[in-house]
Amino acid sequence: VAVKTPHQNVTFESSGTQAHGYLALPESGKGPGVIVIQEWWGLTDHIRDIADRLAAQGFVALAPDLYGGAITHDGEEAGQMMSQLPEERGAELLSGAVDYLLASESVTSTKLGTIGFCMGGGFVLQLAAQQGEKISAAVPFYGVGQGVPNDFSGVRAAVQGHYANFDDLYPVADAKAQEEQIRLESGAEVQYFYYDGKHAFHNDENPAGNYDAQLATLAWQRAVDFLRQKAS
């Protein structure tokens, strides 16, 4: 669902290097901040659209480019690109994005929300574990193993997960075990929703052929309501 909002490509510091991202602003120019974390395909039009849709809901949304401009629509190539991204480098880029947003005059919140899909779902949880009090809401959509921390004790954010019962990349049993691990190790508010769909059911570009409009609409509304409640 394409939404037009004020947006721009931005550059920010990350561990002494230049990083890039896509920034979408609400019409007012100000709002609570949200980090949007890409899938293994790269910083695609779909991820930009997610940022635009969040901006239309009143958020300042930044989607960092974890691949340095590379994009693919081929599953095998995407898997290679994901495996070639060191988790430490991904974490550094996201840490720089957090600092950039929190320092922005456009951001009205003192903490940030974060939402991510596929690979980005794993990095959402890593970001919450590493950044502690800076992240107030973490929303992973069908996160895979990439980027997921071993220890969730640093999580201070409320967590809302969206996972598929028929996910061939991340079994639902693993998601349920992860949900319980986060709850036990962090003491945070954790709620995972499980949908009768497949991996990437929310991606309306449909590169995997698994898009489900009804499930996507339900999950998106839950996520937006949660971010509005926890990240404002």
What residues fall within each predicted segment?
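Conserved alpha/beta-hydrolase "acid-adjacent" motif
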Residues: 169-174
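Alpha/beta-hydrolase fold nucleophile elbow
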Residues: 106-117
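Short beta-strand/loop motif that positions the catalytic acidic residue
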Residues: 155, 161-163
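Gly/Ala-rich beta-loop-alpha elbow adjacent to hydrolase catalytic centers
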Residues: 116-120, 124
